[in-house]
């Protein structure tokens, strides 16, 4: 199953890459945007996690554990091995490939995101990405400012790290996307923003939180531990006017 998905992604990326720069107003999650948590194998929770603003989904796996004590806020629902979850996973695969095919404005390989202030754009890491401390995303007065981060392998945050958006809209993390080539791990006490689209798995350690975003794993598991995730409404394409020309580092470490 995993090999088939990877081959499908390669085909989609190849077709998307040539046109991505022209149409990159936002990353369309499709029906995956209705999920705060989406995984393929298992969703496992420990402690009093609170999931709000989206469904919890699993496909093709069948094991969701830890709810309760975890809470899924109404009116959102669990979709386990059903047609809704399967379609969301298919849409996630398409969104992941689209994000991976965007042309990056700046290569940050080998640099820690902590201490940086970045403007809207697409940023890439050939392999892993690390966040230690605070990453500031400056939307420069544009409520629809788009930030895309492409990682060849892992995304890891140190304990008590944070992503902060300034000069943006009321729900700033809604247009921040993290395309992770393998797995993502949010360290204890991390305060994060944006949608994590991981090819494999996502782990949120104790008291790591996502304000305005989601955790979406294509082939693996999502593991939670006393977390809060608040998803947001993904904007329609017709309401977006952002161009991806640009992107830059305002202030380094």
Question: What spans do the regions from the language model cover?
Answer:
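Intrinsic disorder/low-complexity segments
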Residues: 12, 16, 235-236, 240
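Sec-dependent, cleavable N-terminal signal peptides
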Residues: 1-22, 248-249
